[in-house]
């Protein structure tokens, strides 16, 4: 009789230990649902120094960023985010930020905003799980202050964007309304593992499949879509995955995703650099500031050089 009792006690201890480990890890998990705090409304704290009515941009690039990513923002300002004309079309770049509890970081961003005039900010905690709020803030800004933009791109701070090739493809596409493109995700499912960065509970999203959406690393849409998404977003249940949330809005609007080109141009997984390859892509992920500067310089230095036909 002693052996079964000891075995039962051993099993109970194992179960108890597993439960203790689970809850201790959950309390330390930075991606649990309780880790994000958001406000659905609020005034803009910072607005960029630009007037779209006087000089309507062809392409507005909205870059999600955080207070600690100054090096990333500076590298972007010196490369693909520099305000300039491409094929006679004006491009403008703006950075999307929330707020931080650090007084020093707040002051630094205030000074940066005064110097560059390219920061859009609202009063919500700047954490990963508020990326939907950050993205919708940018879309709201286009809706309210820059509806004249022909196209909008939402992207991230660790991206290489070939704005020259993107502009060329958009001009060839000749689409001005209800257009949305990027790295298409057409058959994605919610991740239910609590320790995943992309965990979504049944209470947050009860369905078993996501609608078609584009990877949040970089997607492009015609200017009219900004106002349509902003208006319909008020009736769409909030989900912390911003690319999925935008996909839900597009589903409500019956806007279908389209390929930008017959060949792949968006690379959310990263790529090995070569001048000829990067001339024919639109977006590449996992690019550090120093690397971005090096890639950009290599592309600038090779202007006029021929590449083998694809």
Swiss-Prot record:
It is an enzyme of class 2 (transferase). Residues 1-7 are cytoplasmic. GO terms for molecular function: N-acetyl-beta-D-glucosaminide beta-(1,3)-galactosyltransferase activity. The chain crosses the membrane at residues 8-28. Its EC number is 2.4.1.-. Keywords: Glycoprotein, Glycosyltransferase, Golgi apparatus, Lipid metabolism, Membrane, Signal-anchor, Transferase, Transmembrane, Transmembrane helix. It catalyses: a globoside Gb4Cer (d18:1(4E)) + UDP-alpha-D-galactose = a globoside GalGb4Cer (d18:1(4E)) + UDP + H(+). GO terms for biological process: lipid metabolic process; oligosaccharide biosynthetic process; protein glycosylation; protein O-linked glycosylation; response to bacterium. One of its GO terms (cellular component) is endoplasmic reticulum. It is found in: Golgi apparatus membrane. Expressed in stomach, jejunum, colon, pancreas, small intestine, testis and gastrointestinal and pancreatic cancer cell lines. Hardly detected in lung, liver, adrenal gland and peripheral blood leukocytes. Belongs to the glycosyltransferase 31 family. Catalyzes the transfer of Gal to GlcNAc-based acceptors with a preference for the core3 O-linked glycan GlcNAc(beta1,3)GalNAc structure. Can use glycolipid LC3Cer as an efficient acceptor. This is Beta-1,3-galactosyltransferase 5. It comes from Homo sapiens (Human). The lineage of its organism: Eukaryota, Metazoa, Chordata, Craniata, Vertebrata. The gene is B3GALT5.
């Amino acid at each position: 009789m002693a052996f079964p009792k000891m075995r039962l006690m051993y099993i109970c201890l194992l179960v108890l230990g597993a439960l203790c480990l689970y809850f201790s890890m959950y309390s330390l998990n930075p991606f649990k649902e309780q880790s994000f705090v958001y406000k659905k409304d609020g005034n803009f704290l910072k607005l960029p120094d630009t007037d779209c009515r006087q000089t309507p941009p062809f392409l507005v690039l909205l870059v999600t960023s955080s207070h600690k990513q100054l090096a990333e923002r500076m590298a972007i300002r010196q490369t693909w985010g520099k305000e300039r004309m491409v094929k006679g079309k004006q491009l403008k770049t703006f950075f999307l930020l929330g707020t931080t509890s650090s007084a020093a970081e707040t002051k630094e961003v205030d000074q940066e905003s005064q110097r560059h005039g390219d920061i859009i900010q609202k009063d919500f905690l700047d954490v990963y799980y508020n990326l939907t709020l950050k993205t919708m803030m940018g879309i709201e800004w286009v809706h309210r202050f820059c509806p004249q933009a022909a196209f909008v791109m939402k992207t991230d701070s660790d991206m290489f964007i070939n704005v020259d090739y993107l502009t060329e493809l958009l001009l060839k596409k000749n689409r001005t309304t209800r257009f949305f493109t990027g790295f298409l995700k057409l058959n994605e499912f919610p991740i239910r593992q609590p320790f995943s960065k992309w965990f979504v509970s049944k209470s947050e999203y009860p369905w078993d499949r996501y609608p078609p959406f584009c990877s949040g690393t970089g997607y492009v849409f015609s200017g009219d879509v900004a106002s349509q998404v902003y208006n319909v977003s008020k009736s769409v249940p909030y989900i912390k995955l911003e690319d999925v949330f935008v996909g839900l809005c597009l589903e409500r609007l019956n806007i279908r995703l389209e390929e930008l080109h017959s060949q792949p141009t968006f690379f959310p997984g990263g790529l090995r650099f070569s001048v000829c390859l990067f001339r024919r892509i639109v977006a590449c992920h996992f690019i550090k500031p120093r690397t971005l500067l090096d890639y950009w310089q290599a592309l600038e230095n090779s202007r006029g050089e021929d590449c083998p036909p694809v």
